[in-house]
Amino acid sequence: MADPQPRSDSPSGQSAVSHDEDEGSVLGTGLTTRHIEAFGRKVTTTASHLMAPKSDPTLTTHYQSAMSDIQRELRRPTVQRKVFSFAQTTPTDLVRSKLSTSEIQYRALSALPDELLANIPEDTSTYSLFQGFQASMPEDDNEHRKSHRRRRSHGQKLLEDSGKSSRPLPQTVGSLKRERDVLNRRLEMMGIRKNMCSAEIHEIDNKIANLNNMRKIVLDRLAGLEMDEAELEHELVQLDNRLEDMEEAMEESATLISTPKAVDDEVTLDSENQAMDASFMSESIYEKIPSPKAWKHKSLRKRSMPILHEHFEPGSMIRELQAHNDMITAMDFDVPFGTMVSSALDDTVRVWDLNLGRCMGFLEGHHASVRCLQVENNIVATGSMDASIRLWDLSRASYAPRDNRITRDDEEDDDDALGYEDPSAEPPPPPPSSMEDCPLFSLEAHVDEVTALHFRGDTLISGSADKTLRQWDLVKGRCVQTLDVLWAAAQASSIMGGGDSQWRPTGRLPDASADFVGALQCFDAALACGTADGMIRLWDLRSGQVHRSLVGHTGPITCLQFDDVHLITGSLDRSIRIWDLRTGSIYDAYAYDHPITSMMFDTRRIVAAAGEDVVKVYDKTDGRHWDCGAGVTAEEEGITPAIVERVRIKDGYLTEGRKDGTIGIWTC
């Protein structure tokens, strides 16, 4: 009896079973090597039929026409782009997708290479990119506010009418849940927006830090350029001086060659007679005529103005110098980062290079402390307690801005160093020969100490404790006019009918240490002078008379300065007053807690020394008062700066001198 299901041992049966298993493996696990080989044989067979020669009788023309159509289709750009998109997909994906066009296009567009995925930075954000996108979408806040107001007003109305109305609430549980979900969603969006704002703030802070670093680099570059400019200008001045000396020497030699000997003898006799006359005239101190060097006023202008300090924050310290060993009595400088001259009660007058903070040398010649000085371009005028006035030409100083220590001899003494590293140490003496060619001449006619001076052009005005003002001609080197302040006060009181009192101090408490002439300034024929009686007198140098007196201070005048419209004065009565020169009235006034010892202004600010360890600054543009100096951060740093005695400001570049001999340089 035969079996209902006979077992077949034929190869065809085995191949059928294995074929089913292989097909299952293809669908389940993917391609195998056997399937790839079978697919290759089929492709080879098909290609052999397609590429057979035309002489083959078994070949039909259908294959030839089909290949031509396929070639035309493949040349289309759309088909080529599809082929390239296929190339980005693995064969396994092609088989799994069963060559579906839509799926292949989706995979080609959405697939990202591993290189791009590896470059994605790690993010610690608690929200996703899609949530951030949703949070960045604008919302209608007005509708939300209106609905919130409606709910609040309706709730209040329900509370008010709870006893009158018993109708049920219109909201259902579902609507309340939906409203709660909406509010939770809004709250979630609010949190995401807060995180986004915080991230933006951190990003802005990083950008600001990077910009500050870039700004610092550019500032260092600007400082180097200005230093190079200063060196070049110094070399130009030296070359101009050498050229001028050579021209003078050539003129003198030509004059000596062309002048006969007899004429030289007559000139010698005349010079001897003039010398004898000068010796007789020197007995009268009011008509002493010095024999100075030839005065040649040169209006030197700097070709470039420093602008580095304009890029600092106001109140920033640029440098601090331990300039002297005693209280600063006077100081002045020409331009920011230029040349400064300072004097103190240690009987020294020092010249400083503000660009490097180094001492250039000493101005020696006075026999006592210098009380007042002025720097104008390369000319310096100093007034001393020895009753003399001396003028100096700093362009003749032998000073190298950058002293190359490598090129110096080893046996050279280091006592002539121009700088010092320890600010607390005593400043070392600069080279003794650096300023030996700077003195021009001396003006000696006062009989008491010189307390104030000012020069402009070829005219210098000086005020002394001998109660006189003197006008000097710098070309001839002699006094051309003497103004008696007491006589002028007496004349003014007699004209105004002031009785028999000729000098009437207006101060509440007389100060014996106050200077009789506290400050003065001249411009052409106009002179403003402040004295110990608290009066500001405006003189006309052409007539030698006082044409106006400004009354208002109750203490000695210590400082003044005027421009085209206003005159600003400071006094020991602790006030600073701004006068209108057109009307003679007070335009503005303000006061401090201590007497004013020094004051100066530029186009924007008025700075004053008012008996404190800071400089008092008044901003004229916005009327703001603020402090500048070492005393601002004294408590934080644990230091006790000395009292500020003298201040100078030009173009926002502030210098202040203190009682301990320290000079601070600030931006203002």
From Swiss-Prot:
Keyword GTP-binding: no
UniProt gene name: MDV1
InterPro entries reported for this sequence: G-protein_beta_WD-40_rep (IPR020472), WD40/YVTN_repeat-like_dom_sf (IPR015943), WD40_repeat_CS (IPR019775), WD40_repeat_dom_sf (IPR036322), WD40_rpt (IPR001680)
Compositionally biased tracts (Polar residues): 7-17
Extent of Basic residues compositional bias: 145-155
Keywords recorded for this protein, A-Z: Coiled coil, Membrane, Mitochondrion, Mitochondrion outer membrane, Repeat, WD repeat
Pfam families: WD40
SUPFAM superfamilies: WD40 repeat-like
Biased composition (Acidic residues): 409-419
Swiss-Prot/TrEMBL GO biological process terms: mitochondrial fission; peroxisome fission
Cellular component terms (Gene Ontology): mitochondrial outer membrane
UniProt source species: Coccidioides immitis (strain RS) (Valley fever fungus)
Role according to the record: Involved in mitochondrial fission. Acts as an adapter protein required to form mitochondrial fission complexes. Formation of these complexes is required to promote constriction and fission of the mitochondrial compartment at a late step in mitochondrial division.
Extent of the WD repeats: 323-364, 365-402, 445-484, 490-549, 552-591, 593-628, 634-668
Protein name: Mitochondrial division protein 1
Family: Belongs to the WD repeat MDV1/CAF4 family.
